[in-house]
Amino acid sequence: MPTITSYFGFLLAVLTITSGLFISLRKLRLI
């Protein structure tokens, strides 16, 4: 169970970082 929780947390962190980078890239392109 702890392994699944840690994996889910890691996946969520990666998704957040990826979305943040994507948003920043879009903002740079808009500017």
Curated annotation (Swiss-Prot):
Keyword Plastid tagged: yes
Subunit structure: The 4 large subunits of the cytochrome b6-f complex are cytochrome b6, subunit IV (17 kDa polypeptide, PetD), cytochrome f and the Rieske protein, while the 4 small subunits are PetG, PetL, PetM and PetN. The complex functions as a dimer.
Annotated membrane topology: Single-pass membrane protein
GO molecular function per UniProt: electron transporter, transferring electrons within cytochrome b6/f complex of photosystem II activity
Keywords linked to the UniProt accession: Chloroplast, Electron transport, Membrane, Photosynthesis, Plastid, Thylakoid, Transmembrane, Transmembrane helix, Transport
Subcellular location: Plastid, Chloroplast thylakoid membrane
Spans traversing the lipid bilayer: 3-23
Protein name per its UniProtKB record: Cytochrome b6-f complex subunit 6
Task of the protein: Component of the cytochrome b6-f complex, which mediates electron transfer between photosystem II (PSII) and photosystem I (PSI), cyclic electron flow around PSI, and state transitions. PetL is important for photoautotrophic growth as well as for electron transfer efficiency and stability of the cytochrome b6-f complex.
Predominant cellular place of this UniProt entry's protein: plastid
GO biological process, one term: photosynthesis
Family: Belongs to the PetL family.
Matches recorded under InterPro entries: Cyt_b6/f_cplx_su6
A GO cellular component entry from the record: cytochrome b6f complex
Organism from which the protein derives: Lotus japonicus
Pfam families documented for this protein: PetL
